[in-house]
Amino acid sequence: MPLVTPIDISDPSVKELVKFFNETLGFCPNSVLTMQRRPNIAKAFIELNMAVMENHGKLTSEFKRLLAFVSSNTAGCRYCQAHTIRAAERYGSTSKRLENVWDFKNQDAFTDAEKAALEFAQEASMVPVNVAEDTEKQLHVYWSDDDIVEIMGVIALFGYLNRWNDVMATSLEGDAKTSGQDLLKGISWVPGKHA
C-alpha cells in the first residue's frame, strides 16, 4: 500500500501533467500525481526531467531510458525498472536491447561506448557510490564532457525517483506493470510493494 495516495487523475490540477507524460509513458505516473500534492515539487521535477531528457550530444532518448533502467535496476526500485524499460521501448529500443540490458556487459546489442556509459551508470547508482577509476577512464574514451553531464543527469534524476518511489511504495500503473512482466523476464521481475 502506498505511503501517500496520489491525487485523482480527474483532478483539474493535473491536466497538464497528464498531457506531458502521455508522450513518454502513455499515462501520467502515480509518482507525479503524488508529488502534485505539493505542486511546486511536481513542477520542479518536470522541469528537471525535461532538461535531463533533452538531447544535445550523442545520447538518444532511447539510450537515456536504458541508462535510467540500469540505474534503477542497481538501486532495486521495481517501480522505476518498469517505467524505464517501458519508456525505452516507446522510444524505439529493440527487443534484444530491452530484454538484455540488465546483462549489457555480455551483449553485442550494445556498442563499447554504450557499455562504458552503462557501466558508469551501474557503479554511480550503488550506495555507497563506487565508481572505479578505470570506469571513468573508459567513459572519457567514448564520451565528451558535455555527454558525461547528460549521462550523470539521467543517473541523478533516477536517484531521486528511485528513492521517492521505493519509500512511497508508489503503486504501479497497469501498463507499466505489463511492460515489466513482458520485458524483464530475464531478471525475474515482480512488482513487489508496488503491486
State the predicted function of each range.
Residues 1-195:
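Hydrophobic alpha-helical segments
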